[in-house]
Amino acid sequence: MDKYKIADRRLEVAASFGRRGARVADIGTDHASLPIYLVGNGIAPCALACDINEGPLRAAKLNIASAELTDRIDTCLTDGLNGIDGYGPEDIYILGMGGELISRIVLSSRLSKKEGVRLILQPMTHAHDLRRDLFASGFDIVDEALVRDRDRVYQIIVAEYDGIIRTATQVELWLGKENIERGGADLRDLASLYAFGLGKKIKGYAEAGKTDEQANELFCELKRLAETVN
């Protein structure tokens, strides 16, 4: 049984993709909840809790001290991955941000492309843009998952750099190829949510006398998944 608990199901599933023994960096740390869980339970030997703002770092420091892990978890005031190369992180978590921001953080740093580095990403929005940018920049999505937490379905994307440029269908970018292959209620509900939003957008196009064939095709595929996945 884990000594240190994590209340957030989203963070718990993200943590499950970490590799035992890997040095961790948590970018945009959430009160250091994830580093405390990983280090406190012996999954990671040490961790770096990072944030661009002082407030979250102050809260993180208090929680780290309360957990008696100040000798194994450090904090860092930084923008994205800037300035943490010397720490040598192997598993980098970037959770709870917009997909476009995550993409900017990942692609603007050479650290993310270093051999042996794994990225565990959880976009709140624009997961399709994040996947597209990863594939176009030589990253492989080695695993992914859908997780339901507080009546919302989140996407978790695990990526590693190998320099190979990849492509994917529109629906694979939106939902993830492995998630589609697995199926399940979470996939069905997420496809339904995306289809609803895209349907409103298509209706707006029609009212303006415009059409978007790519959007129409994606809408049909999302709707099909929403109606047929068990």
Q: Whereabouts are the PLM-identified features?
A:
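S-adenosyl-L-methionine
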Residues: 1-21, 36, 58-87
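Conserved SAM-binding motif I beta-strand of class I
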Residues: 46-51
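Class I S-adenosyl-L-methionine
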Residues: 2-7, 82, 100-230
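Conserved SAM/SAH-binding beta-strand->alpha-helix loop
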Residues: 53-55
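Short SAM/SAH-binding signature in class I
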Residues: 89-96
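Conserved SAM-binding loop of SAM-dependent methyltransferases across substrates and taxa
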Residues: 31-44
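Conserved class I S-adenosyl-L-methionine
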Residues: 21-30
